[in-house]
Amino acid sequence: MSHAVAPFKRRLRDALESDSLPMALGRVLPLLDGRRREAFHGRDFPAEQARLAAIRKRDVADGPRLLQQFTAVAEKAGMVVHPPADADAVRETVAELLRQASARMVVKSKSMATEEIGLRQALEADGLEVVETDLGEFLVQIADELPSHIVAPALHITRERAAELIGSVTGQDLPPDPDTLVRAAREYLRDKFIAADAGITGANALVASTGSVMLVSNEGNARLCSSLPSLHIVVAGVDKLVATMTDAAATLDMLPASATGQTMSSYVSFISGPSRSADIEMSLSLGVHGPRDVHVVLLDNGREAMRRDPMFQTALQCVRCGACSNVCPTYQQVGGHAMGHIYTGPIGLLLTSFHHGMENVAGPQSLCAGCGACATVCPAGIP
């Protein structure tokens, strides 16, 4: 299934001629980078960067073994792990799981892997109601647009437009006040969480030694998507495989500070199987207060080819923090819709060629100034 991505020249022209985009970028990007600088104040960033880079490099190189280990441990714990596949196969696997569950309504947390393969659009075409529950993704869904930033998908949307978008689905005349808009979105989405037949999330890490899925979020929506419905489907790239909890913790040491300037995100969850209880005579029952069924659907879609490419394998070290976009002088002028395809900003220039083809990266690649600002802030040491 193709993504509804406009031609590069049109996206670039729209960005340069936009009246609202400079306002949105000017409000948010300096704030994000300022928070990142403050979060790392007093820390030895080069040393921490080198440590995470070494861990990510080792785990990427050891990917095939980690895949076998994760699959064995996760399935022993009661999850079903689907082997790595391309975009078409992953979409069909998820659709079939939802058909088998007779699901009609799905809640979804923010996931670049699902954006990469156009999963929501495919499921909607299959007749399902799919609701993005991350506030930024919710705004982008209402606007019928694509995310413009890896961490802040609605970064290009001003608060004034956000009020119009949320009001269009809630039927309210809302002021451009962030707190008011968040409350309105919360009230609207709460019923969706309760009614959902299935929840779809991504993963920030897949821990091979424990068979665990790590989820990191601030809004709490990922936890609701993964715990309220009876079916939880995880869609994750094989690049998310890490060897141990120690390796996952190394990502946690750097990801929140690099992405949002936090010491730690509000919610960190490790999911190691379906909800269970043995409180009645030690007889195991699944599906207590959380899902009865947990499926991990793994995505390759060019990742193994990237892992084997000595020039590009370091791109798999990416932890999806978006810091490179925040300091990129070109991104600061034109945003992610022009400087990117599905994956935006500097890292998107590397990933797009493998995930979506060289034809979709040629235009955005021409915007790179070659200044190297991205490398100075990358927590995983991608040059």
Indicate residue ranges for each PLM-predicted region:
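The feature marks the mature, well-folded catalytic cores of soluble enzymes
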Residues: 1-310
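Short, cationic low-complexity segments
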Residues: 313-326
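A glycine-rich phosphate-binding loop feature that marks nucleotide/adenosyl-phosphate handling sites
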Residues: 89, 266-275, 320, 331-335, ...
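Ferredoxin-type iron-sulfur electron-transfer modules in oxidoreductases and energy-metabolism complexes
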Residues: 286-315, 330-383
